[in-house]
Amino acid sequence: MNFSEKLQQTLGKAIKDASNEEIYAALLNTVKEAAADKGRNISEKGRKVYYISAEFLIGKLLSNNLINLGVYDEVRELLAANGKDICEIEEVEPEPSLGNGGLGRLAACFLDSIATLGLEGDGIGLNYHLGLFKQVFENHKQKETPNPWIQNTSWLTDTGIGFDVPFKDFSLHSKLYDIDVTGYENGTNKLHLFDIESVNENIVGDGIAFDKNDIRENLTLFLYPDDSDKQGELLRIYQQYFMVSNGAQFILKECEEKGYALEELDKHVVIQINDTHPSMVIPELIRLLTARGISMDKAIEIVTNTCAYTNHTILAEALEKWPVDYLEAVVPHLMPIIRELAARVAAKYNNKDVQIIDEWNRVHMARMDMHYGFSVNGVAALHTEILKDVELKPFYDIYPEKFNNKTNGITFRRWLMHCDKKLVEWMDKYGVGEFRKDASKLEGLLAQIDNEEALNALLDVKQQNKTALKEYLEKESGIVLNDNAIFDIQIKRLHEYKRQQMNVLYIIYKYLDIKAGNKPKRPITMIFGAKAAPAYIIAKDIIHVILCLQELIKNDPEVAPYLQVVMVENYNVTMAEKLIPACEVSEQISLASKEASGTGNMKFMLNGAVTLGTEDGANVEIHQLVGDENIYIFGESSDQVIEHYAKSDYVAADYYINDADIRKWVDFIISPEMMKIGDVRTLLEIHAELIQKDWFMTLLDVKDYVQTKERVFADYEDRMSWAKKMIVNIAKAGFFSSDRTIAEYNRDIWHV
């Protein structure tokens, strides 16, 4: 029985007579069966990787699974023959609320590639019921509401497995749900998500407010609950320990079932710690091994040879440090082990910068990972060099053999084959070769760089994608885009270092320039998508400024025909899949030295956008691949920025006082036009922040940014030249396949 026959049997009625909801449910169950039939990926070496992460931003799964199972076209045609549109079926599916930004999306891409390469490897995380939050805009401000996603018809499978997780005053029994991870034309792996049976979604009050002390009911409600107070920090510790204790118990259970001796755990298991959230897996594994009779020395040796750590940030505040008394309040049984680990480090090294427990009695999670793991990797070439030379230099001096780079990547199944089917058709027509499993074949596109027919066809694909975005946004939110405008897009987590505020200053420049009578040759549409953490006031204030500008420009008849600002609500994977194929100018404007890698830059590049960015993160490698003519780089270098911080010689007020243009742009934030629309206090605070602090040096780079962006828009008018830039970017994007990244992890770290 083929897939279509199984689908019809599961549905139990004629497709033409079924609702979209019924068809979706039948497809989901048929895909689950097909994934089971594919069988699990099994390592010939008897070795398995477990990828532990606080978040997995997996996106909707139906189409991705149909593509990986090789039945997407078959299903699409079957539905069409019965008067059904597969795109409408896809809209029925809720997006899982299991992630936030690049960290979680990377984890999802990695799981896809691990399965596609046929490696034995599973993800381990938590089953958040309400996600980060659903973003709505009210009075030009972000408001957070719960984002429930779990339905009776779900990709989650109840495994019947659970473990007891001990805390100081009580224990909780977990419940394990699995989601199948299908490999492209290969076997399947699993994403293991742990939950509690007593979770209660009804305890959430106004917005996303809830009792943070009620651990038995709130533990798996939200991803990254507000940690701006002690209760929030304690809840984060509860969550992290619940995740790693379940993960560690599950790993040992699997090993024992396979008949492995736990004394040889490191021969059969590798645990990849994705950022610092899962770091307590190190002392927890040691605790569980010593409880089974293994000596402390041996347990430490085993765990050190089992765990590997990926660093994802250069921002010091993101390297988690928990007060000892907080850990004592939640997991006192771990503290003797953590103290033992810290004592061994202190006995060997007298440098305070490498101590696990610092002089303020805080436990540094990343330091524990580096001392008691066998690998430390950065996620882009520049990032890894900064870790070795600056941020983690004391550790590199001790353990140079542990440090390695693994430049991030993205899965082309989702970010090309699923979300940009028209571009795939163009690639197939112009003879790229089998890029679906070998992304390096994209280089074959360079043969078309002087083919005017191919160039025009590529421009037409982009135009069709812009029109598709226009239609989608109008249908979903009533926003009307001008699809003849240039689409300039910045979509990423809202953070000062990503510098959405600098984009704001460009918009102000352009608004004032148009008001002065300087009309652009072509309309410009600036699109933002971003959520700000609920307690991150400045980030929320930046959203407020963007939304105020959106209204100001929309209602100004002198400017609206030439400039549009749109901030999409509740930016998520589904929205990214619509925005990225339509993008023409990719905004990657973080302060040099602050973005570890970025993966949005790769997705845009793959879909034919041209990058406007700083020499930061993976932008550096994009620049090296495409050359000076096919990317727009501005701003000071990472070395210059690091020197500014070292010397404390950047003073934002000097730029404000000494440059009339910068002063005009910044002051417009508190102009009568803006004050009439926005909240006065908020606008005053952002204005003061830019002049008095500006920790991420917006005013340092803004003039160069404005001038470079004007050059981008001028160059855009030479359509053939622009199409050639598009081809080069697409052709060179093959390096950024997560299949390549995972192959490198396996070659150098996992050896699965």
Model segments located where?
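A conserved ligand/cofactor-binding region detector
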Residues: 1-752
